[in-house]
């Protein structure tokens, strides 16, 4: 990395540090004006953003439009529309005296760093940025070096909307991220893998910076044999195979009773063929996404090959096209825990099925492993649902659906332990980027 880039990073960090007194006093109107500039810039560059993302990873136009563009605009508007309510001090009373009172004040953390991922490179970087700005912070942003076209247009969006003392963006490879992590940020927000999350947390510890880590994990899906299999298949097909399975909360593997396994797989194949395929073997390029790079393609192929060697069977799919970096939607059965595919997050369009007889088997299996980012249950049996929810831990859970909880701003979104630290969306994002200050007020004599 050039010395000039290092110097620029340090210069911009110090520039933003000097703005903190003014930012702490910023009003809802001032913050809303920044967010409006942000929104206007996203709208102005909308088609360029879509084109850049599709250059980095071939995604269907409608997927990019919905997830990356509409998702970003929704996040910005949600922050704009709720600023006064979120910023207002909250009275909590006092446990010491009827003449005293306690209030909670929300103040900006300061200079924040936002490190984005490659799977949804625009929205998963810009939505946290909106929360940081709503909380009154300044920010430095870096997107993944796997999506350089998206990074280039994101830089244009940010520079058209903000002075660098408000928001700055740096582009480049891992050396740039390393230099950024050397700065004493007040808060770091990272979305990506657990392994890199550990690196980020180690860097933050040097300065005792608070962190939000949006990571991943193996999110289990459980189907009760009494549930409507067509409904489950439609929802799982979208949650698993949109973006070729490269979604942190995609169903990673499936627990299903053996007596309905083949029937479910047949229904799922029909749904998948209608939604993603040209024929039984070839994904429709206009509807299906590539794997991001050769390294990840080869990693997933290794997981698949190991599973087959150990006795797993392909129910449908299993077609790997290295020249196009596509893996056809694939379902495996006769999967066992010792297979590599059950030991790391798949992050691709392969769904392993495992059988169970009693729900306690599933609960024990989940609890013996790292806590997942999400857990899904398809059932009409409230006792079964309650049993799973009460006896497992996951970042989030959804009942009779998958993935959609991400879009519900009334819920916090985040992981637990290896699947993440902290949460955001809606008011939870505002609080994540704020210092909640308790103030004790004693009545004057």
Swiss-Prot record:
GO terms for molecular function: aldehyde dehydrogenase (NAD+) activity. It is an enzyme of class 1 (oxidoreductase). Pfam families: Aldedh. Disruption phenotype: No effect on vanillin degradation. PROSITE patterns: ALDEHYDE_DEHYDR_CYS, ALDEHYDE_DEHYDR_GLU. Keywords: NAD, Oxidoreductase. One of its GO terms (cellular component) is cytoplasm. Belongs to the aldehyde dehydrogenase family. It catalyses: an aldehyde + NAD(+) + H2O = a carboxylate + NADH + 2 H(+). Its EC number is 1.2.1.3. InterPro entries: Ald_DH/histidinol_DH, Ald_DH_C, Ald_DH_CS_CYS, Ald_DH_CS_GLU, Ald_DH_N, Aldehyde_DH_dom, Aldehyde_DH_NAD(P). SUPFAM superfamilies: ALDH-like (SSF53720). This is Putative aldehyde dehydrogenase AldX.
